[in-house]
Amino acid sequence: MRTIINNQKKERDILLSRPYLTRHTQYDVDELTASKQIKLITGPRRTGKSTEALLMLKDRNFAYLNFDDGKLLSAWDDDLVWETLRAVYPDFEYLLLDEVQNLDGWDLWVSKLYRMGINMVITGSNAKLLSSEMATLLTGRYIQIEMLPFSLSEFFIWNHRNLSEVSEMKDSASDLSLIADYLHHGGYPETVAARSLTQNYLSTLFDSIIWKDIAKRHKVRNVEDLNNLAMYLVSNFCNPFSANELAEALGFSSVATTKKFMGYLREPYLLYYLPRYNNKLKVMKKAPQKVYVVDNGFVEAKAFSVSENLGRLLENQVFIELVRRGYHAETSLFYYRSRNDKETDFVTRQGAHVESLIQVCYDLSSERTLKREVDSIIECAGELKCSNLIIVTMNEERVIEKNGYKVKVLPIYKF
């Protein structure tokens, strides 16, 4: 055990020696580390959770365990691990547990350490496992921080540009090129510095998530059906669907299995499902949901269709940005369809109050397109009694006044 933990310490020190981009979170690092609550950093695989945890603790005395290490898991013994940690890291003040969900019974061990007064930072890639088990044993004892792929702003910083200082994109071909790059290839940290490797890297990562995070964990026997469903949903991102429609389209014999697989695909933060807004929960649950992908790069890497759909790529980007800002599907983020079947892409809600309606349209230069998008958002605004109306575009900015409403048209770089 001592050899395993010593080797992990060497890996930790190598990781700490590398340069990193400081990510944007809503928390102050000093306040976080001072808190005795468990710091839970969640999100998809390979989005920088471990890096964020290391940066949080880099100037502090901390011990480190990496649960992606099969040797550690196979040799696991609670008392032996604790004894060895104390020997390898004398007088450590913090404990970093990386990808802790890989340890069977991790929640009981973490709960024990918490009662001992250990100040912990935990990372994990499984939304359901972490949320359910943390909620069961550690309610009110942890702070959750969600790490997603780089935002557009972070992508600009990586490329030595500042998005907030760009005032007129129309005069900057290089800035527009960066946005187009991000729109197509996404923001996974490992890919932003090596775009030629993006498709291969994300294809491999996607397959790893299907096999390691889902099929192996849930003991899925028909992995081919699971993979086909994942590929179908990624190919049809931003579109509404129901489990019955998916089962029929893919030739699955069981709608129940389809629903179960859909849930599995959500757990590792691969896909998100957005419900249609309705004040009646039962009606909302029955309506088709729209599917979104955690990063646009997965679309290029795994989608069936080779045809380009800039509008859907932009819509997916806006959805992930809303999630990054703290909105959650089913509680504060929805789509909406009016009684006349006019649709608004996103409804944000604060408590019981509808906060804003957001429509996404890549290009409004066509009068027909402009009329369709503006009429849709205004009709939905009337039904939902909302006056904060936004249309996000690739590169247009203006204010449109119609029927007593003001619709703000914003380019994606100002959203």
Protein language model annotation of sequence segments:
Residues 394-415:
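Domain-level recognition of nuclease-like catalytic cores that cleave nucleotide substrates
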Residues 1-32:
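A short, basic N-terminal segment
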Residues 41:
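Hydrophobic anchor at the beta1->P-loop junction of P-loop NTPases
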Residues 119-125, 146:
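Structural recognition of the conserved hydrophobic beta-strand(s) that form the central parallel beta-sheet
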Residues 196-354:
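Accessory nucleic acid-recognition modules appended to NTPase machines
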Residues 2-14, 133-240:
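Interdomain motor-coupling "hinge/lid" segment immediately C-terminal to the ATP-binding subdomain
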Residues 49-50:
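Conserved lysine of the Walker
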Residues 63-93:
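Short glycine-rich substrate-engagement loop in P-loop NTPases that contacts/grips substrate
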